[in-house]
Amino acid sequence: PEWVEKYGQKAAYFCTNDAHTEPLLKQLLEYGGYFIEADLPSPLMGYPGALGLDLTEEAGDFEKILNKVESAIVEKGGADHFGTWAYSYGYTLSAGLALHAKNVLDGKSELLDMDDVAAALQGYSPKAAWNGAGYTNATTGVKSDNVFLIYQDTYIMGDPGHFMGNADVEIPEKYFTIS
């Protein structure tokens, strides 16, 4: 409540300590503010506890999980103020990168092709777009061939909810070396 009083209801909040996500969500639902996504984005990160949701019946089905979380957010007046990756970070990266490795071994994909990586991730997140680029050392300007920074388009919960389109944004190279 102090931060909302200080910064207002139009401020966006973020935390890197997962244990703080649930209480932050509860307070933002009560006092106002924005929460675009967690550091490990997922509809499972903080939302079920903050909203008092039992997701037993939806377990393993991220579209149903997101729908239930989104309905609860809208019901509590948080439409267009809360976001997440529609498909869990942990799940999609684990399953998607395993599929990418299999595709590489089967000769269907190139190991260091970002489009091939994104296509494998898409298999476990069918409605979300992906983007990324090779990591660039900000100090030296050297771009890594085998380390990617990847991200899923952010989903903003609402009535209706929508993807932000951030996976379609081309980041200018000049920003890769800001230090």
Residue ranges and their predicted role:
Residues 1-179:
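A residue-level marker of the well-folded mature domains of exported/periplasmic proteins
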